[in-house]
Amino acid sequence: MTYRAEYLWIDGAEPTAEIRSKTKILADGDEPGIWGYDGSSTNQATGDNSDVVLKPVFQCPDPIRGGENILVMCETFLTDKETPHPTNTRALARAAEEKYGDQDPWFGLEQEYTMIDPVSYTHLTLPTIRSV
């Protein structure tokens, strides 16, 4: 039997980063491995040197296809398979986590509001609001 591995990655950031994918048919028991694609079609390489390497970093069941099919989240690398592609922002996040992983992250949420006069649609300042 076989199953489908849907490789997913983030493409070049020009004009904006998008999710790309391609499917590989694997025999039962085979694990998804390193794969590649033509980076010139995703603004990640020039036509004369267009190979980009996909390295799997996470896999999970495919919720759309079901069965034994899986989604394979990938990072992009240059052809030496060691150097992250310049558009691989996950590599930067991984490096930061490795460096600062022993620290506890703190998050601060801020919600801003603007008071607008319903007649003139001008912004109301605090002294104006107090006089209303």
Which residue stretches match the model-derived regions?
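Flexible, glycine/charged-enriched surface loops at secondary-structure junctions
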Residues: G101-E110
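Conserved small/polar residues in nucleotide/adenosyl-binding loops
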Residues: T122-T128
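Acidic/polar, glycine-rich intrinsically disordered N-terminal extensions of enzymes
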Residues: M1-Y100
